[in-house]
């Protein structure tokens, strides 16, 4: 995270993966009686919405489309929404789009947070899967601005993508100590304690950077293979970071069914990751293709796709 000094006792907490952490953080933060907005990208990681609804808040969706480089148009959010907002979720690199927020965009969001007094929760689980340059993180921007207290800023990260350990359920939350202190108190009742063996395995994974670089190299090779072999058959656009293709198709559900029926390849229809808004459903006519299989399996997938395209 390019931070020189972070007090591990006040500015971070270990969690059982970011799914659990995101859900419980929302429950700890939201005042149900206020029925505030939680602003989030659309499409999105489904825990954002589920946690919001179960906390008694209202989701407000910002459509992430090709027109706004899949980053959303924060200027289009009405002032009356910001005034009632308790929490803003961002995901950078994005799931499913792979889009990365710039330093300038983070600064704009921090200014909005100061103006309207809401919390920014940055889901950065894909932040270590990049091609040429590491993406900027929220806390890094805070430090550059001299905000060493990280006021109203929280980051979520885990071993799931970085180390290919999604089943171990291990991650951390870092940021504003004034938010983490009551969140820790909530967690003492929540009962989410990490077993010692998971702690030891987590330490080993966090301490080793070579396997992370090896992981990045493998993803680079897989994306290069897909671009070379299928770029003339499919509108493949390499993401800014992450391991997903966000592929434009004529009809996402039909495309997914055809791939499953004819080639036994599973992709996720984009409409399942997004919600209908007044501007439409930004996930429609897209599918999410995850390059998480090894290179040999990816080569097999490519041959199967060539046979039916």
Predicted regions and their residues:
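PLP-dependent class I/II
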Residues: 2-309
């Amino acid at each position: 995270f390019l931070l020189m000094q972070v007090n591990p006792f006040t500015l971070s907490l270990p969690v059982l993966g970011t799914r659990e952490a995101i859900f419980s953080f929302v429950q700890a933060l939201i005042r149900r009686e206020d029925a505030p907005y939680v602003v989030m990208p659309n499409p999105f990681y489904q825990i954002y919405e589920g946690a919001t609804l179960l906390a008694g808040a209202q989701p407000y969706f910002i459509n992430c489309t090709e027109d706004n480089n899949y980053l959303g148009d924060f200027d289009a959010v009405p002032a009356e929404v910001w005034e009632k907002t308790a929490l803003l979720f961002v995901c950078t690199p994005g799931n499913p789009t792979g889009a990365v927020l710039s330093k300038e965009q983070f600064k704009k969001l921090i200014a909005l947070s100061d103006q309207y007094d809401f919390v920014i929760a940055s889901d950065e689980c894909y932040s270590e899967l990049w091609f040429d340059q590491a993406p900027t993180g929220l806390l890094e921007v805070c430090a550059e601005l001299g905000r060493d207290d990280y006021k109203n800023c929280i980051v979520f990260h885990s071993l799931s993508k970085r180390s290919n350990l999604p089943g171990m359920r291990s991650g951390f939350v870092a940021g504003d100590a004034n938010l983490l202190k009551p969140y820790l108190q909530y967690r003492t009742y929540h009962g989410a304690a990490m077993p010692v063996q998971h702690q030891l395995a987590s330490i080993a994974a966090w301490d080793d950077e070579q396997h992370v670089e090896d992981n990045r190299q493998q993803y680079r090779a897989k994306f290069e293979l897909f671009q070379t072999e299928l770029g003339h058959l499919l509108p493949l656009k390499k993401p800014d970071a992450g391991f997903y293709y966000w592929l434009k198709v004529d009809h996402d559900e039909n495309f997914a069914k055809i791939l499953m029926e004819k080639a036994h390849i599973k992709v996720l229809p984009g409409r399942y990751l997004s919600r209908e808004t007044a501007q439409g459903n930004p996930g429609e006519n897209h599918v999410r293709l995850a390059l998480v299989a090894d290179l040999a399996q990816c080569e097999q997938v490519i041959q199967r796709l060539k046979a039916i395209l």
